[in-house]
C-alpha cells in the first residue's frame, strides 16, 4: 500500500469481513448436504487454495527486506500515546469477553432462534464493513482522541442495550450495529497508530503486539465472566462490562489530538 497504507487499509480490510460472511453462509449451506465430520477437510481445502493463491501476489516495489538486527520495540511502547492506546485496547477487549464467549448461548437461553442469532452476528460484520468503507470521513473531521472516546462510550452503550433489552430482537440489532465503532473504527485507529509510531521493520511486531493485547483482554475477561456467569445473570455481566469499558476514558488524555497528515 506504500504511503497510502493507512488511507487504503479500511477499504481493503472490508473484504476480509465480506469473506467471513460469505464463508459462514456457504459452509453452513454445504454442511446441510455433507456430514459435519467433513468440516476439517473442507477447511483444509479452503486454506490450501488460499495458500496457492498467495503465490500469485507480486512483491511490491520497495518492500522491506529481512533485518539482521531487529529494532527494539520497548522505546516505542514506552511512548505515552502508544502505552495509553494499548492499555485502552486491553480494557476494551476485556469488556468484549462476555460477548465473544457467551453471547450466542446467552441469546439461546432467552429463546432466540438459531436464525435470529446468526442474523445478529451477520449484522455486526455488516456494520464493520460499512465502517471500513467510509471511516476516512471520520478521520477528516474528528481528532484521534475524540474518536477513541466515542468508541469507548458507544461500546458501553452497546453492552447496556444487550443487558436492558435482552429479550428484544430490535434491541440486540441496534447493539450489533454499534460493532462498527466498538471494533471497526477502533481497529482502524489501531492500524494508524502502528503505521505512525512503528518503523517499517517494526510494524509486523507492532501488529503482533496489538493481537496479543487483544487476546489477553478477551482471555482474562472470559475467565472472570465465566466464573461469575452462574453467580450473577447474563444481564448483570453485560452491565458490568458497560462500566468496565468506561475506565478506558482515563487514558484518552495521553492520546494525540490529531493523526499526522501522512497517515490520514
Please report, for each region that a protein language model flagged, where it lies by residue.
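Juxtamembrane intracellular "pre-TM" segments in multi-pass secondary transporters
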Residues: 57-89
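A membrane-interface helix-boundary motif in multi-pass transporters
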Residues: 29-45, 227-245
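Structural signature of the two symmetry-related core transmembrane helices
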Residues: 146-161
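Helix-loop boundary and gating motifs at the non-cytosolic
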Residues: 81-120
Amino acid at each position: 500500500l506504500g504511503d497510502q497504507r493507512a488511507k487504503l487499509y479500511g477499504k481493503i480490510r472490508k473484504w476480509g469481513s465480506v469473506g467471513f460472511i460469505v464463508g459462514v453462509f456457504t459452509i453452513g449451506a454445504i454442511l446441510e448436504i455433507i456430514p459435519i465430520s467433513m468440516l476439517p477437510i473442507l477447511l483444509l481445502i479452503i486454506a490450501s487454495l488460499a495458500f496457492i493463491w498467495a503465490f500469485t501476489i507480486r512483491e511490491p516495489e520497495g518492500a522491506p527486506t529481512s533485518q539482521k538486527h531487529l529494532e527494539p520495540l520497548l522505546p516505542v511502547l514506552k511512548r505515552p500515546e502508544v502505552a495509553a492506546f494499548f492499555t485502552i485496547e486491553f480494557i476494551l477487549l476485556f469488556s468484549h469477553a462476555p460477548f465473544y464467549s457467551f453471547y450466542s448461548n446467552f441469546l439461546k437461553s432467552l429463546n432466540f432462534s438459531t436464525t435470529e442469532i446468526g442474523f445478529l452476528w451477520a449484522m455486526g460484520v455488516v456494520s464493520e464493513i460499512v465502517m471500513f468503507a467510509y471511516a476516512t470521513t471520520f478521520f477528516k473531521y474528528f481528532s484521534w482522541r475524540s474518536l477513541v472516546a466515542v468508541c469507548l462510550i458507544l461500546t458501553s452503550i452497546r453492552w447496556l442495550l444487550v443487558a436492558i433489552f435482552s429479550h428484544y430482537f430490535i434491541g440486540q440489532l441496534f447493539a450489533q450495529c454499534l460493532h462498527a465503532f466498538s471494533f471497526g473504527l477502533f481497529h482502524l485507529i489501531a492500524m494508524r497508530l502502528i503505521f505512525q509510531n512503528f518503523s517499517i521493520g517494526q510494524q509486523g511486531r507492532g501488529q503482533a503486539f496489538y493481537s496479543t493485547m487483544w487476546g489477553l483482554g478477551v482471555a482474562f475477561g472470559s475467565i472472570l465472566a465465566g466464573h461469575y456467569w452462574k453467580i450473577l445473570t447474563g444481564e448483570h455481566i453485560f452491565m458490568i462490562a458497560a462500566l468496565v469499558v468506561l475506565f478506558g476514558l482515563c487514558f484518552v488524555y495521553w492520546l494525540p489530538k490529531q493523526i499526522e497528515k501522512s497517515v490520514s
